[in-house]
Amino acid sequence: IIGDLGNFPAFRGGVAMGPYLQEKFGIPVYINNDGDLFAYGEALAGFLPEVNQTLQLNGVTRQYRNLLGITLGTGFGGGVVLDGVLLRGDNGCGGDVWCMRNERYPQMIAEEGVSIRAVRRVYQEESGQDVEGLTPYDIYQIAEGKREGNPQAAKEAFRQLGEVAGEAMANALNIVDGVAVIGGGLAGAGKYILPGVVAALKGTAGTFGGNAFPILQMDVFNWEDEADREK
């Protein structure tokens, strides 16, 4: 840990976390960020093998080998696995999506629209209510009608998050050309986030000649939607 990070208040001045944990537990330790490791786990023993097994059981011979993993939480994380190998990149930045351009606010990074702070900001803008003390879970509860507040504003906060995430994912998927899986603390609000994600992934972009093309060259299916999955 190089910097003095808010997420690690007990570690200051630079801590060699890998060697520390290895000595502490007596086992090999591999250190990486949550986005990379989420993607790696889903590729080796999670979503990717689940998709391939389901296809196989239904008589489909095609198998997927590449995966984009996205984490929604304090920030906007990502990781890429290509044919079983985690994409590290020459500078350790492989799969980083947080600093892509924000589709709603092009002068901002994507993470300003895909994060805990984004959910709170949009809810406050849409509802006109102070969000002091409100967590994303509280806002989810408002969307569900289980807590006092503005349900439509709460749903819109998650939808906008999905829209910005979906645009960034579309850019990444055009390069990765594989399946995508979403996780992280905010993923529990998936019923309100996924519509924005899917709508963005199914978006189009035009040419000066007046033609419109899908922003993704491949078809988009929501694995959580049974009707989509059967396609």
Where are these regions (language model features)?
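Short, active-site-adjacent cap segments at secondary-structure transitions
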Residues: 1, 36-39, 77, 187-190
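Short clusters of small/polar residues that mark proteolytic maturation junctions
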Residues: 6-7, 91-92, 102
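Conserved phosphate-binding catalytic cores of ATP/NTP-utilizing and phosphoryl-transfer enzymes
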Residues: 29-67
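Short beta-strand scaffold segments in enzyme catalytic cores
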Residues: 69-71, 76-81
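Short beta-strand-loop/turn "lid" adjacent to the catalytic site in phosphate-handling enzymes
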Residues: 1-14, 28-30, 42, 72, ...
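ATP-binding/phosphotransfer module of carbohydrate and carboxylate kinases, centering on a glycine-rich
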Residues: 19, 23-27, 50, 54-62, ...
